């Protein structure tokens, strides 16, 4: 496995692989890798000959009071995990390589509708930053396939739309959420949780499952179900950001006729923001 830091190096190596007829898969990450990330790498390896994992803590997708400065940078440990998972190439650029003229002068990609609401409402500018850097990575790597986790459900929808709308020839693949034994979705930010908070955190997934069970039993009073879920989170000691029942394709509020539903949740536990989701077919 090789690690490169410049776009020039990246393109030179990938040109050689393409001349050999190899297919290329991309797994974009911000590093601080866990088993969820590694599952994406394995999925990419199943679907392509060469796997490129990018490690870049993207400043454009962080808000003013978020954890850009404290987000863990663990490149050496990440490299060890990736090598063991069958990754081929690590692209770990610095900020200057991606944004040579600075963020203020950077062309930005805005994905309408699907990026609005939910995390888009709570984190203004976040999906603009995600869409911009992912579009750049698609252009830099020119992958045949790219793998993203379903844990970030709205992000996956944003990326699928941008690839479709901008006619980028890449197959965007979603990979199932990897969970701890108690149901907590694996996340780089779980490391911020105290021992006490870690014991409380599984209530997020339990609340999703309980609400999904209610829907499976035929309930369609979505606003009441959403409030019940927020109340359950609050009673457990979390501060709900949102709990929304949406159409799985549009991410708009679900109607009684919708058959494909997704439950989206974000909640603070202490200072840590946890997100999760669960999709069902009725």
Swiss-Prot record:
GO biological process: pantothenate biosynthetic process
Broadest EC class assigned to this enzyme: ligase
Function: Catalyzes the condensation of pantoate with beta-alanine in an ATP-dependent reaction via a pantoyl-adenylate intermediate.
Name of the protein in its database record: Pantothenate synthetase
Protein family according to the UniProt entry: Belongs to the pantothenate synthetase family.
Extra information: The reaction proceeds by a bi uni uni bi ping pong mechanism.
Record lineage: Bacteria, Pseudomonadati, Pseudomonadota, Gammaproteobacteria, Pseudomonadales
Any Gene Ontology CC annotation: cytosol
Keyword presence, Ligase: yes
Keywords recorded for this protein, A-Z: ATP-binding, Cytoplasm, Ligase, Nucleotide-binding, Pantothenate biosynthesis
Pathway(s) annotated for this protein in UniProt: Cofactor biosynthesis; (R)-pantothenate biosynthesis; (R)-pantothenate from (R)-pantoate and beta-alanine: step 1/1
Residues annotated to bind (R)-pantoate: 61, 155
Catalytic reaction(s) noted: (R)-pantoate + beta-alanine + ATP = (R)-pantothenate + AMP + diphosphate + H(+)
Species name: Marinobacter nauticus (strain ATCC 700491 / DSM 11845 / VT8) (Marinobacter aquaeolei)
Principal location: cytoplasm
Subcellular location per the Swiss-Prot or TrEMBL entry: Cytoplasm
Residues the entry annotates as binding ATP: 30-37, 149-152, 178, 186-189
Active-site residues annotated for this sequence: 37 (proton donor)
């Amino acid at each position: 496995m090789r690690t490169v830091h410049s776009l020039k190096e990246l393109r030179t190596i990938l040109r050689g692989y393409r001349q050999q007829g190899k297919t290329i898969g991309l797994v974009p990450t911000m590093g601080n890798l866990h088993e969820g990330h590694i599952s994406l790498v394995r999925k990419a390896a199943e679907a392509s000959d060469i796997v490129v994992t990018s490690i870049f803590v993207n400043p454009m997708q962080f808000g003013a009071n978020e954890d850009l400065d404290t987000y863990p940078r663990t490149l050496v440990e990440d490299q060890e995990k990736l090598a063991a998972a069958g990754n081929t190439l690590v692209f770990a650029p610095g900020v200057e390589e991606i944004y040579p003229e600075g963020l203020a002068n950077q062309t930005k990609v805005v994905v309408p509708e699907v990026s609005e609401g939910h995390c888009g409402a709570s984190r203004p500018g976040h999906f603009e930053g995600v869409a911009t850097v992912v579009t750049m990575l698609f252009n830099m790597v020119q992958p045949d396939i790219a793998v993203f986790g379903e844990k970030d459900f709205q992000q996956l929808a944003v990326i699928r739309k941008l690839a479709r709308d901008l006619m980028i020839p890449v197959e965007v693949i979603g990979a199932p959420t990897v969970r701890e034994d108690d149901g907590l979705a694996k996340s780089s930010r779980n490391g911020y949780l105290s021992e006490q908070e870690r014991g409380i955190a599984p209530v997020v997934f339990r609340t999703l499952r309980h609400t999904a069970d209610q829907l499976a039993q035929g309930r369609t009073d979505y606003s009441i179900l959403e409030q019940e879920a927020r109340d359950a989170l609050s009673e457990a000691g979390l501060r709900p950001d949102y709990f929304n029942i949406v159409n799985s394709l549009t991410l708009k509020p679900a109607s009684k006729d919708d058959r494909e539903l997704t439950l989206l949740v974000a909640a603070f536990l202490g200072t840590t923001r946890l997100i999760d989701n669960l999709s069902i077919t009725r």
